Amino acid sequence: MTTTRQFLYVRPPVGMPEESCFELVARPMPQTAEGQVLVRIHYLSIDPYFRRQMAGAHGYRDGLRPGAVMIGRGIGEVVESRFADLARGDFVLGETGWRAHAALDGAALKKLDPAIQPLSLYLGLLGQSGGTAGIGLFDVARLQP
């Protein structure tokens, strides 16, 4: 049986998160259902909101439960597709969690433009963090050239 790896969230941190808050485990390779794709994750985003989720439910998301795959956005390559709009070799952005492979709903993923390099820009400057910074600089601070 082919396996993959994933990080589980195992306990809330006291102070700063540390290695003991997570556990790296081997799991069977996920199988895809109709409408899903199997993604091999290349990049993971490490975001400030993770810490808040480790403390329990806040705002728009439920808190993390011990034993769950650690949350987070990732960029990966489609290695198997059962979703018409994505093909093997496409790169996508989505809520992948901290794992090497994930079976994800194709409709929930954003297909990336491979001409934009490095692809990791989609997790920073071209992603949620960059959008948040842009609102702060241009809408709030009214930055001028």
Regions found by a protein language model. Give the residues of each.
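Glycine-rich beta-strand-centered segment in the early N-terminal region that forms part
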Residues: 29-46, 54-98
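Short acidic-glycine loop/turn motifs at beta-strand connectors
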Residues: 10, 82, 105-106
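Short glycine/threonine/proline-enriched tight-turn/helix- or strand-capping micro-motif at secondary-structure
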Residues: 17-28
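Flexible, glycine-rich phosphate/dinucleotide-binding loops
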Residues: 15, 85, 101
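Short N-terminal binding/cap micro-motifs at the start of the first secondary-structure element
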Residues: 13-19, 48-49
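Short glycine-/acidic-enriched loop or helix-start segments at secondary-structure transitions
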Residues: 50-51, 104
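Short structural boundary motif marking the start of a folded domain
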Residues: 2-7
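NAD(P)H dinucleotide-binding glycine-rich loop of Rossmann-like/cofactor-binding domains
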Residues: 72-77, 88-145
